[in-house]
Amino acid sequence: MATLSFKPSERYRLSDWRTNSYLLSTNAERQRDASHQIRQEARILRNETNNQIVWDEHDNRTRLAERIDTVNRWKETLDKCLTDLDAEIDSLAQAKESAEQNLQAKNLPLDVAIECLTLRESRRDIDVVRDPVEEELLKEVEVIEATKKVLQEKISQAFQHLCLLQEIRQQLNSDHRDKMETLEIDRGCLSLNLTSPNISLKVNPTRIPKDSTTLQQWDEFTRFNKNRAEAEMKASIELREAIALAIAQTNNELDAQRVATEFTFRKRLREMESFYSELKWQEKNTLEEIAELQGDIRRLEEDLRRKMMNLKLAHTRLESRTYRSNVELCRDQTQYGLIDEVHQLEATINTMKQKLAQTQNALDALFKHLARIQADIACKTNTLLLDTKCMDTRRKLTVPAEKFVPQVDTFTRTTNRTLSPLKICQLELT
């Protein structure tokens, strides 16, 4: 009888085999179902994520485009604002320069007014008077100083506002430059796609950078810069109008004062010429009267000498008749007549001597008054010359410098002319 040469392996039951086959089949179906479910979910997920990514990329591309449009609109607004601001800065600078030129132009009227006051300091004696001309000249100096003060204030305001506009311009430039950089970055982002060579994963790209701002803060910042620039440009326009008005008003005030001063000068010159003519007429009449009086004195002296000769004759006759002898020494009619003649001659001579003394006193008085008249004529001549020089000097205010030719000799002028203490005191009092 034959025997097995190997040990038999463990045997499974048929039911176990069938169960195992069933389980394998069932598990295979379940795994296939699960795999199918996973495949379907993966497909759905892939489709959904693909769609989501497409829409997200489309939305963000749209947002980028809209953001670029928004930033570009603000950039264009800032462009216009900067252009307007540059134009306003130039206009205000021109207005400031015009005010500075007008301020510089006030030096000539001031110099002329001070020169006229200085010239009139050379008046002499009674002509050193506080007349309307001096009052107008002092008023002119006061008006010029006031106009210079007004213009200087406007120049200072323009300078300060120019500094403010420059500061605003720098702020706008900075904002404009930032927006240009932003547009460049966002346009670069908008141009990127899946095939772009320079795309890559970044380290923590979702981080919030330091000093980030909200959209509201961003909008308010740019709007504030724009509104501030517009407000300051409006203020600059008002300042330019105020500068133009100040220039016009100061020029009108100065021109009106110049006309008033020159009218007073002409009136004073006519008055002075009238007094001068009157004095010359008085001098002529006084000289004629002196000549006539001197002639009368000579005739009085000649008559007095003749009367003395007549007196000598009468004295000699009376003295000679005292030498008659004896009874011939008679007091006859001849003696009485000679005595009467002597008395009459002595009275006449005394009267004539008194009249001669009165005439000589009158002549002395005429000579003294003539000296006063001639001294006053010299003063008036000097004053007329000085006022004529002043009028000639004032022609510089209406005649261009290149065409100005002095009509009379004038004093050498200095740049920094100062008033006398008397004039300074008068200016302070006014």
Swiss-Prot record:
Tissue: Expressed in the testes (at protein level).
PTM notes: Ubiquitinated, leading to its degradation. Deubiquitinated by USP16, promoting its stability. Tyrosine phosphorylated.
Protein name: Tektin-2
Protein family: Belongs to the tektin family.
Organism lineage: Eukaryota, Metazoa, Chordata, Craniata, Vertebrata
Gene Ontology biological process: flagellated sperm motility; inner dynein arm assembly
Pfam families: Tektin
Gene: Tekt2
Subcellular compartments: Cytoplasm, Cytoskeleton, Cilium axoneme; Cytoplasm, Cytoskeleton, Flagellum axoneme; Cytoplasm, Cytoskeleton, Microtubule organizing center
Range of residues in the leader sequence: none
Primary role: Microtubule inner protein (MIP) part of the dynein-decorated doublet microtubules (DMTs) in cilia and flagellar axoneme. Plays a key role in the assembly or attachment of the inner dynein arm to microtubules in sperm flagella and tracheal cilia. Forms filamentous polymers in the walls of ciliary and flagellar microtubules.
